Amino acid sequence: MFSDAKLIDSKNNAFFKRLVKISQNKEKALCLLEGIHLCQDFLAKADGAQLKAAIFQASALSKAANEANSELMQLYQCLNTSPTILADQLFKQLCDVPSPQGVIFLIEPAQRPLDELLVDKTMVLVDRVQDPGNLGTIIRTVAAAGIKQLVLSSGTVKAWSPKVLRSAQGAHFAITIFTEVDLTVLVNKLKLPIYATALSDEARSLYALDLARECAWLLGNEGQGVSREVLAQATAEVFIPQAEAVESLNVAVACGIILFEQRRQRLAQLASSFYGQD
């Protein structure tokens, strides 16, 4: 049944050794997608990314072959590339979770040139966010809010690392992500207002802003916030009103609040325009 697959059962295999390095983020151009859901999303939505190898866990694949309507088996059968089967002990060395689902894709994410950025359309700019869980949640939130562009500064955690991918739950493939961007240069090229989250005396309340129009949101590092050089070029600084008992919000939580306040205002404007026609 698996005659088209290559079986690897030795830790000394050159391809397996390379996979280990990639799993440790030692090759920036490649990454591993782990789990059925992520791999399905890649096949359905990936734009410009390349599938380099499809890797299956030996025992999981054997079990799936004897199950009706197995998602793992369906994934195996829809591939246009010859799969690789890893012995269980080798497969688990590549996994970032204790209970793997039996499939990993080796992919080369699309590297988007900055000239593809739509400088007059809403986007989120991320300045040196370090926590993978935070970045993954931001990516997922941006996609859920209907925003299509995310720009990551140099010094931001790798967008395609295993923990970021797991937190984002496939949202990478719903938006366009630009990485390693010099924000001090980019912000001068944007043709829309730039709102930076900050807690300064000059900051304006989120709920006092008209957010129905296009804008750029600027989110900063967990401890340091937005860098001074970039912050100085923002149109306005914005804060989220909150109880005094807490000094500040987590950056990913703040991202969700501001993006969905903008979405609420836009939907309200659309509803007003629609019902105002009568």
Where on the chain are the PLM-derived regions?
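RNA substrate-binding interface of SAM-dependent RNA methyltransferases
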Residues: 44, 84, 111-204
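Structured adenosyl-cofactor binding patch, chiefly the S-adenosyl-L-methionine
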Residues: 105, 141-145, 156, 161-173, ...
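Acidic/glycine-rich phosphate/pyrophosphate-binding loops and surrounding catalytic core
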Residues: 96-99, 103-118
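Amphipathic alpha-helical repeat scaffolds
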Residues: 35, 130-137, 249-254
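Short acidic-hydrophobic, aromatic-tinged amphipathic segments that line or gate anion-handling sites
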Residues: 5-11, 82-87, 175-183, 238
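A glycine-rich helix N-cap at a beta->alpha junction
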Residues: 71-96, 178
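Boundary-proximal intrinsically disordered activation/regulatory segments immediately upstream
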Residues: 1-67, 156-158
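Active-site/ligand-binding-proximal alpha/beta "capping" segment
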Residues: 196-246
